[in-house]
Design a protein with these regions (language model features):
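N-terminal subdomain of nucleotide-sugar transferases
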Residues: 1-57, 98-100, 242
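Acceptor-binding helix/loop patch of EC 2.4 sugar-transfer enzymes
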Residues: 66-79, 128-163
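Donor nucleotide-sugar binding/catalytic pocket of nucleotide-sugar-dependent glycosyltransferases
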Residues: 126, 155-158, 162, 166-208
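Conserved catalytic-core segment of nucleotide-activated headgroup transferases in glycan assembly
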Residues: 197-266, 272, 276-277, 284
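Conserved acidic donor-binding segment of nucleotide-sugar-dependent glycosyltransferases
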Residues: 329-337, 345-350
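Acidic donor-binding loop of glycosyltransferase active sites
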Residues: 284-298, 309-311
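A charged, aromatic-enriched C-terminal amphipathic alpha-helix characteristic of glycosyltransferases
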Residues: 351-381
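Short hydrophobic beta-strand element within catalytic cores of glycosyltransferases
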Residues: 302-305, 312-315
Length: 382
């Protein structure tokens, strides 16, 4: 089939964030049996470098100015959708559909669902949307956790998201999620009955062996630090770590675009990496991973990544969503004290550490095989 893959970020299995990695794997898989054209946004200097590895990709360059202009021009849309409402992108989108004789659009992230309106111009085209998370759920949590003017803003955005997401989902041919819980949420909130559940790709090839030495008594957090939910969780973990008062222990916050507040926490036993070339190697230096997330939505690929790399993971119920919500292999902890106790228990018991590590690897291999996604793609695109 002739497929047009559209995304808000550059798809690449070597991207520095989980969404980009997962999209890159989808493109690779789709290309095995189809003619795939990729159209994406390039959002920063890092992605400018990334796009050079893909001379066959079509793209539109964004800037802070273009984001502001688009947001102001489309006040009826939630900001995160409005910034992608680009005339340049839309014109190129239409041009490629015509030139490449596109039969199916494969869109990533809810914001790209707005381009489903292309079906008014091309009624025979199929439009499939991958919901990396259920956007309305994320905004519900922000409304609950905010106060004052921020609460008013979040509530207004929530209402716009609900209206926009409902409209997009009513028009698409198929919706894909990365876990059954998100599929159930779409059915509950929007009466979606055309949902397929994929397994996400989180960046691990289990055929590769690693010989990276662990730093004794080391803890890590992983995430794109420009995202507020990751920043808040990292700052929370630092507070917990400081209260543990273990001078021989090390904490590493791994991820690009850390805010100054986070950078200011750098000390003898707290390290803020910023961007790293090989995130897997950086994670593997550590003995455990901790994700004290308080909001966000969808499956947390960073949790799967750490888990699959053999690190025992301590996280909240939000971090466990779509992975192991009953805590069979994840260590679930909600309060700061519970998280601190879980860290102490793991780092003070080497046998338990090894046992949980092996269980995690086996769990990810069994439950999150990419083969399931390959099968679904073959069914959809034949």
């Amino acid at each position: 089939m002739n497929i047009l893959h559209i995304s808000p970020y550059v798809p690449d299995v070597h991207a520095n964030h989980a969404g980009g990695v997962c999209m890159g794997k989808q493109v690779e898989t789709l290309k095995k049996n189809n003619h795939v054209t990729v159209l994406t946004f390039v959002n920063n200097e890092y992605e400018q470098g990334l796009i050079k590895n893909h001379p066959d990709y079509y793209y539109v360059q964004t800037s802070k100015g273009s984001f502001v202009k688009n947001a102001i021009s489309h006040l009826n849309m939630p900001n995160m959708f409005a910034i992608r409402n680009s005339k340049q992108f839309r014109d190129l989108f239409i041009k490629l559909i015509k030139e490449k004789d596109i039969e199916v659009v494969h869109a990533e992230f809810t914001a790209m669902g707005q381009f489903v309106l292309i079906k008014d111009m091309f009624p025979n085209i199929q439009f499939n949307l991958v919901e990396h998370d259920v956007t309305i759920q994320s905004y519900q949590r922000q409304v609950q956790d905010s106060k004052g003017l921020k609460h008013i803003y979040c509530l207004a955005e929530y209402n716009k998201v609900k209206k926009s997401e409902a409209m997009y989902l009513s028009k698409v041919d198929h919706v894909m999620t990365f876990n059954q819980k998100d599929a159930n949420l779409l059915k509950k909130n929007y009466s979606c009955n055309n949902v397929k559940v994929l397994n996400p790709y989180y960046g691990i090839d289990f055929s590769e062996s690693n010989t990276i030495d662990k730093i004794p008594n080391s803890i890590c957090f992983v995430g794109q630090m420009g995202r507020n939910e990751n920043h808040v969780a990292a700052m929370r973990l630092i507070r917990i770590f400081k209260k543990l008062n273990q001078k021989e222990w090390k904490l590493t916050i791994i991820g690009a675009y850390p805010k100054q507040e986070l950078l200011d926490q750098e000390s003898e036993n707290i390290h803020i990496t910023g961007f790293v070339d090989d995130i897997n190697k950086e994670i593997l230096k550590n003995e455990i991973a901790v994700f004290p997330l308080t909001y966000g939505a969808g499956i947390k690929l960073k949790v799967l990544l750490a888990f699959g790399l053999g690190l025992p993971v301590i996280t909240t119920s939000i971090g466990a969503e779509g992975i192991d919500e009953s805590g069979k292999v994840l260590c679930l902890a909600e309060s700061d004290d519970d998280i601190a106790n879980a860290i102490n228990e793991l780092l003070s018991n080497r046998d338990l550490l090894k046992q949980v590590s092996q269980k995690g690897i086996e769990f990810v291999r069994e439950k999150f095989s990419w083969n399931k996604t390959e099968t679904i793609f073959k069914e959809l695109y034949q």
